[in-house]
């Protein structure tokens, strides 16, 4: 019988953390956070990390892995997760992967990181090209390196073009060759069965929960936490300082919005994130795995609809 990995995804404020605790306790399982912000030390309130008490009750992984000044991308998370899966399974326990960061979740289901090495010199070369010649400069060099083949990229998205050019230069290959090589990579965790579910709520109920959560974060000291993070060099990490909640507090601290505008701004940012999360979950998980929780209710671990994942 194959070992099984369990995946609990959910939009922000859906109640997945409470459900994860309940399910893990009932199954003698451990929890692996799949959140691109919770992995940073000091980003506690905005990431809604589990309390110290919860972390004592149930072993948690994937939290507080890096300083806010460090770069921590999906490739590092992927390697870390592989170690956690191996260790937890070796102890004969179940593992519940919990989160809402789509790209990080994706690393459990399909290859997302290839072996192209991009040196600092290449990165600087590409950035200088973009600064001097803009998108047109990137497209010209990509066209030359790819011998006129269609790029298959959003040609108005500079970030995508920058990364594509870096990978072409780092590998010496065309994008079509890189894609072919990437598609031949093995499926992650192919030896495991995978059971998935994702939590969601009706919009009106979710809106109320988002507002309540935001008010609570501010009352507990999100502004002060952000000030401390800034002192520690947080602004040098774009992924961290542009995340929902923290980005809005930074705007407030720069006097771009007022205190009265802060909570509505965070709520608006959170709703946009929820929309992105839903799109990803619909694409990745079968519709049968969606668990829609009714208003003013909490999900119960014995009433879940798990579906097989691939």
Describe each model-derived feature in a short phrase.
Residues 1-310:
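Phosphate/pyrophosphate-binding catalytic cores of soluble transferases and nucleic-acid-acting enzymes
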């Amino acid at each position: 019988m194959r070992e099984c990995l369990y995946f609990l995804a959910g939009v922000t404020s859906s109640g997945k953390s409470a459900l994860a605790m309940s399910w893990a306790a009932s199954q003698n399982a451990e929890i692996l956070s799949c959140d691109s912000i919770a992995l940073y030390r000091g980003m506690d309130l905005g990431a809604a990390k589990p309390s110290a008490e919860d972390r004592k009750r149930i072993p948690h992984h994937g939290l507080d892995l890096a300083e806010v000044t460090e770069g921590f991308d999906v490739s590092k998370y992927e390697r870390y997760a592989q170690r956690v899966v191996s260790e937890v399974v070796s102890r004969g326990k179940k593992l519940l992967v919990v989160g809402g960061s789509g790209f990080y979740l994706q690393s459990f289901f399909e290859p997302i990181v290839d072996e192209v090495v991009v040196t600092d010199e290449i990165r600087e070369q590409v950035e200088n090209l973009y600064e001097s010649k803009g998108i047109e400069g990137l497209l010209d060099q990509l066209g030359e390196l790819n011998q006129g083949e269609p790029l298959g990229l959003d040609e108005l998205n500079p970030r995508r073009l920058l990364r594509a050019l870096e990978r072409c230069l780092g590998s010496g290959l065309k994008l079509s060759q890189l894609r072919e090589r990437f598609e031949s990579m093995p499926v992650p965790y192919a030896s495991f069965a995978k059971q998935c579910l994702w939590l969601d709520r009706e919009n009106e109920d979710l809106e109320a929960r988002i507002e309540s959560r935001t008010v609570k974060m501010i009352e507990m000291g999100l502004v002060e936490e952000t000030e401390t993070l800034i002192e520690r060099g947080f602004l040098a990490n774009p992924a961290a300082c542009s995340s929902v909640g923290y980005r809005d507090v930074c705007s407030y601290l720069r006097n771009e919005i007022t205190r009265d505008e802060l909570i509505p701004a965070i709520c608006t940012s959170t709703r946009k994130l929820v929309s992105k999360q839903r799109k990803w979950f619909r694409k990745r998980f079968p519709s049968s795995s969606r668990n829609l929780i009714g208003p003013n209710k909490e999900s119960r671990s014995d009433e879940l609809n798990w579906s097989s994942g691939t």
